[in-house]
Amino acid sequence: MENKVPLLSLCIPTNGRAEWVVPLLESIYSQGEDPALFEVVITDNAANPDLASAVSAMAHPNLKYFPTKSAGFTNQVDAFEKCSGLFCKMLNHRSVLLPGSIRMLLSLVERYRTEKPLIYCTNGVLKTKEEDIDCADLDTFVKRLGIYASWSAGTALWREDLQDIRSKPINSTFPHTVFLFDVREQGPYLIWDGHYHELQNDATSGGYNPFEAFGITFLDLMSRLLKEGRIQPDTFEKVRKDVFLFLRTLHFKEVVLPAKHGYILTDIPEKMSVYYGRRDYRIMVLYNYSVAPFELGANKVRKIFASLKRKVK
């Protein structure tokens, strides 16, 4: 790379999951983009020798692997610190980039390298007519994002915003929020809603209590912004409602239905009561168990049709 600063750094924090990271890397390098324009930085807090060997075998000059000792999700901060690109974009280690997505990200950098807004990438979930959504202030930014602000993989920032990052308050559950809320006192802010990746199988995801993480910790972060006057009460309420709907869906899938992931699901009523109260918890449970028979019946019908289709083939 002749010591030139790449336009784009793709940051991949992981806990040694070679079975996910390798397909992600393949989806990156199969696009054939000029390696001088971007770099890929992996930080692995499990220090998996299999992943290290797989990365070494790929022998790409712009691919960097760093074992780290940071606990849990704070590995995300390590990934950004190891980057040297003008623009740093986090990737979920379970993602696979879509064809042409690196070119899309490089174009994004070129469009905004002068203005340098704080950018968050929502991967098409907002379904807006325009992919580039300007936000005048943090309140507008948070209101448009809602619960998606909790999604670390959408995080992106300019290299210059990384100065003194360790002096900022870093939340151990949502460390990416330091980049969204604390590296700058004001905008400009931009949401990019381009669709650039898909997720691989998440059957083994989990390992934490989502009712504590989202229902308490994430809303604590929103409450701080409200108390500081950086977001308005209606924005906080919008995010609170978003989180409730998310937790209701998660409760339905992880508690009511038989299919389970590895989440910790203890003390749900107590955790829900912090920002919602026992009444909302009871409404959630009643709703989910009233819907369950219909969903289970629909699943059974889908399985029967799938079985018949296989037999026809």
Segments from the language model and where they lie:
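Conserved donor NDP-sugar-binding/catalytic core segment of glycosyltransferases
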Residues: 96-133
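Short, well-formed alpha-helical segments that are part of the catalytic scaffolds
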Residues: 17-31
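Conserved nucleotide-sugar donor-binding catalytic segment
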Residues: 135-213
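Short aromatic/hydrophobic "clamp" motif used to bind/position activated sugar donors
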Residues: 88
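A conserved acidic beta->alpha catalytic loop
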Residues: 41-53
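C-terminal subregions of glycosyltransferases and related glycan-biosynthesis enzymes
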Residues: 178, 185, 191-313
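Glycine-rich, basic loop-to-helix element that forms the pyrophosphate-binding segment
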Residues: 67-83
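Cell-envelope/extracellular polymer assembly enzymes that use nucleotide-activated donors
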Residues: 6-9, 39
